[in-house]
Regions:
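Acidic, metal/ion-coordinating pockets
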Residues: 30-397
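Short non-domain terminal segments
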Residues: 6-9, 28, 48
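Bacterial N-terminal signal peptides
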Residues: 16-28
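Bacterial N-terminal signal peptides that target proteins for export
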Residues: 5-18
Length: 397
């Protein structure tokens, strides 16, 4: 079956045998602290995928609008990556717009139609972080409308709250994924100088606040704590000293995974194997843009980060961490307007006919080559998932 040019669930006998054989060999050989995982001890795993910034520039809003009906649809945006997202137990991305209602606007004060978040949900993104520098672009009404809209879509979210009581009831956000419970926390460096309107709350990067939130997550005995940090300098490919120091502090406090956003370009990823603590760690300083109208070099794409987590007693193991390069294709529609669609870059790289435009194809290749060179030097224990490697993470469900 071929969905959106991404092959899903190819049920060839040889592939099934290969997958089962690999799984049996892996489990039979995999031990933690001398204990065989095939034994009686509890062993639970989950597949989680993280995406970067969901931006909503004016051109994207125009592309989504049906001029005849006045309605909006973003389903095309996510169709090529939906099979990848849906093959995981949970998918999370950063919603860097408000859902404040009309008038719909892009930069600098973002407000997108609810259809944007709806399409992301339909593609498999069930969790959105909302603490970012555009969280208060439309004031108190924008914060409350965004929360209400996401609740109505049954999309889980974390980072902004109607008031202190709302925050107390929602922090941490606990997500069940594949038998594991994940505590998700989201914070931002600021809100573009716009004061947070009372009584609303936006999680800012405040160490006393973060430490208290992590402590609360620990008391809830969640299997893993994931901190989403909106930080760093825009368009810098390397993390700042502040990001590095804060990441070390977050790990020391008890965070297991750190996912960064805001730079709008890919930054390094580090998978840190446990050395005595019994818990693996991972930090992705920035996943880049999942979708936007930014077309400058390195901003026109990003990466999906796929992680297989397992818990064995009190130990957390990141069995596999890999990245999937994504690029924002902007084909010209029959209406004469640019459309927006996120494509798995490695797959489209092999099929020029799926792009059909030399200029865009070459731009995509430039993004791919830049990203592979960068990740080759700045991804610790992380591999690109493409071809057969990508198919192997798509379970036969």
């Amino acid at each position: 079956m071929d969905v959106g040019a991404v092959r899903v669930h190819p049920f060839s006998l040889s592939r099934v045998i290969a997958i089962l054989s690999a799984a049996i060999i892996s489990l039979s050989a995999f031990k933690v602290s001398g204990q065989d995982l095939m034994g009686p001890h509890p062993y639970i795993k989950a597949e989680i995928i993280f995406g970067g910034d969901l931006m909503g520039h004016g051109m994207q809003i125009a592309a989504a609008k049906d001029e005849t009906t006045g309605t909006y649809s973003y389903q095309r945006v996510f169709r090529h990556i939906a099979p990848i997202l849906m093959s995981h137990d949970a998918a999370v991305a950063n919603l860097e717009v408000t859902l404040a209602g009309a008038p719909y606007t892009g930069y600098p004060l973002f407000s997108s139609p609810v259809a944007f978040a709806e399409a992301a949900r339909d593609a498999g993104i069930g969790v959105l972080t909302t603490a970012n520098n555009h969280a208060v672009d439309r004031g108190l009404q924008g914060i409350r409308s965004t929360i209400k809209s996401l609740d109505s879509l049954s999309v889980k979210h974390t980072g902004t709250y109607s008031d202190a009581a709302d925050r107390a009831a929602r922090v941490p956000l606990v997500v069940e994924a594949g038998g594991l419970s994940l505590a998700l926390l989201s914070y931002t460096y600021g809100t573009n100088g716009i004061p947070v309107p009372e009584p609303a709350v936006v999680n800012l990067i405040d160490r006393e606040l973060i430490a208290a939130d992590i402590e609360r997550a620990k008391k809830m005995e969640c299997d893993a704590i994931v901190a989403f940090m909106h930080w760093g300098r825009e368009y810098d490919t390397m993390p700042s000293p502040f990001q590095k120091e804060l990441a070390e502090w977050l790990f020391a406090e008890g965070a297991d995974i750190i996912i960064g956003s805001h730079p709008h370009v890919i930054q390094p990823v580090e998978h840190i194997r446990s050395a005595g603590s019994g818990r693996d760690r991972l930090v992705a300083y920035s996943l880049g843009n999942l979708v936007s109208n930014q077309r400058w070099r390195r901003t026109d794409g990003g990466m999906l980060l796929s992680i297989r987590l397992s818990v064995y007693g009190d130990q957390l193991i990141i069995e596999r961490a890999g990245y999937i390069l994504t690029w924002v294709h902007t084909p010209l529609s029959s209406r004469g307007r640019r459309e927006f669609e996120i494509v798995p870059a490695a797959h489209f790289e092999k099929h020029f006919e799926l792009i059909g435009d030399s200029s865009q194809y070459n731009q995509m290749r430039l993004f791919i080559n830049d990203s592979r060179r960068f990740m080759g030097s700045n991804a610790k224990s992380i591999d690109e998932l493409r071809g057969e490697r990508l198919e192997m993470i798509l379970p036969c469900r």
